[in-house]
Amino acid sequence: MSPDPIPYDAPVVERGFGFFETLLLVGRRAVLWDAHLRRLLATLEALELPAPSGEAVESASRAALAGIADDDAERSLRLSWIAIGHDVEQPASWRLDASVRAIPPNTLERREGSRAMTAPDRFRRDSSGFKSTSYFGAVAALRHARKAGCHEALFRDGDAYVEGSSTALVAWNGGRLAGLGPGGLPSVTAEAFLEGAGERRGVGRGELLAGSFLLGSLTTAAPVLSLDGEECARPPAMLRAIEAFRERLRSDAALQKTL
């Protein structure tokens, strides 16, 4: 991570203008590296903003991992592309940061199963199609959930549930998967799980109660245990699929990049 301070009036500070990716590290192996890098660069291209090169992102990541052994320990790798200058059309106004962090305790606990609640309507994710640092709605919703004794808050679009505050949401539907509907962040981890299968739509409350799970780079995959205090079913086939996917993330070299 750059040791240089960020100006107090930088766009990323005053207006949350920046972008980031969070990756699971297993030792020095970055899980779903290619897909995360692709999403970051595609976002910047779609918004016609300056972008770092893939080589620069990889170099910064390697530097951040200095001294870390290639063992089975799990950590978080955060990649940030943030606006520190006022003229955001100029490459010089942007800064690339890469940092290694511990996985948050709430995330580790959520892996064992998540108690979820419906996010209050007053909390809405800003520009949900982009992984931006403008994250107030998600942070506020997750804080609200934690105060209620839950691990995750779920956003709705009308009557359909779309995503969690920090995770993607998929309904099992007896193996006919559904999730990643309009209005949610395109999830790298959920796409890796689905591998092109499933219906791309919001899901109903009844579908979630019948069996559903959360997906995220650090959460990996976790069943939803309850929704607003109502118990959710956990079909054995769904639990087996979750565990198989988690093991793939940890051990499949095709899904990893050694830094």
Question: What is each PLM-predicted segment?
Answer:
Residues 1-63, 84-259:
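Helix-start/capping segments and mature chain N-termini
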Residues 70-81:
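Ordered, amphipathic secondary-structure segments that act as subunit-interaction surfaces
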